[in-house]
Curated annotation (Swiss-Prot):
Record has Ligase as a keyword: no
Alphabetized UniProt keyword annotations: Lipoyl
Name used for this protein in its record: Glycine cleavage system H protein 2
Family recorded in the similarity comment: Belongs to the GcvH family.
rRNA-binding listed as a keyword: no
NCBIfam families listed in its UniProt record: gcvH, PRK01202.1
Length: 127
């Protein structure tokens, strides 16, 4: 059974989003997603300064099984990427909620309200 932290919001495409105190949004992939992917071997990170709309492809996670696009759960400008993943992509398997992929300055913070809460995500993945 997947771990689903109550304080996070989730996209149906299995990204999580956390609103930070400074108004930024931290993004990663869910425990369910990393389990489905298997051992992560490479993460293609977005460029800082790039602007995405909600649902835009914002990077790629490659595992021994597949390559999977990572989508921006909300629109905004990338203000940071987790460079640690370039050398240690397996961190997404080890700590899916501690290992973020990128941070956004959201263009419309209300988009977070359109994402699933923990219970909604749990229902989506059938757990």
């Amino acid at each position: 059974m997947s771990n689903i932290p109550a304080e996070l919001r989730f996209a149906e495409s299995h990204e999580w989003a956390r609103l930070e105190a400074d108004g930024s949004v931290t993004v990663g992939i869910s425990d369910h997603a990393q389990e489905a992917l298997g051992d992560v071997v490479f993460v293609e990170l977005a460029e800082v300064g790039k602007v995405f709309g909600a649902g835009d492809a914002a990077g790629v996670v490659e595992s021994v099984k597949a390559a999977s696009d990572i989508y921006a759960p909300v629109g905004g400008e990338v203000i940071a990427v987790n460079e640690e993943l370039a050398d240690s992509p397996e961190l997404l398997n080890e700590e899916p909620y501690g290992s973020w992929i990128f941070k956004l300055k959201p263009s419309n913070p209300a988009e977070l309200d359109k994402l699933l809460d923990a219970a909604g995500y749990q229902a989506l993945i059938g757990e």
